[in-house]
Amino acid sequence: ITNRGWRALRDALMYGAEKPDYKEFYQVGLELPSDDPDVLAGQPLRGANNWPRFMPELQRDMNAYFEAVAVCGPALLHGVALSLDIDPDFFVDKYFEPLQRTQAVYYPPQPVSLSDDQFGVAAHADFGNITILWQDDNGGLEVQNLAGEWIAAPPVPDTMVVNAGDLLGRWSNDRYRSTKHRVVNRSGRERISIATFYDPTFTTKVDPRD
């Protein structure tokens, strides 16, 4: 299972949600040939991307973005390690083959006729280590604080959002807590975001005692 390619509007149901997400998206990962050892071994989320033949510029631009974020990931994790007062290179050998997926997400304007429990992305926390998110200027991202209140996380020019996931919460003994979030596109305009899930090598042993 590579989980690559395009998903249609309302084709994805977030775990625990009652209604499918009001979005469509295109997802890519590290491009690996069919004879790669991980692919031959049937390792999940490893393989080739599904590129549309009629849109060659998509492959060019997505690959460029994918590679740029791959440079950001190690620097962010270096900062995480410093903040935890552990070896700054703690994550390096856990990421010798990062499990990185990048998802370009399109949110249509959400009609007022839709019910209040219809979300662009239903409430959830990412299951991985860190998520690096670019979003356009239309807003719609909301995060839940410790009191259970939903607060807007409006886009800030020339910045990206970094979410801690469940894995980082476990790895850090909850010094980092995974961020529950959702999207409701009430802007009346199309919304675009690009999320990159930057996770360790598939075979990495995660031990909070480290």
Task: Give the role of each language-model region.
Residues 1-210:
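Peripheral, non-catalytic segments flanking oxidoreductase cores
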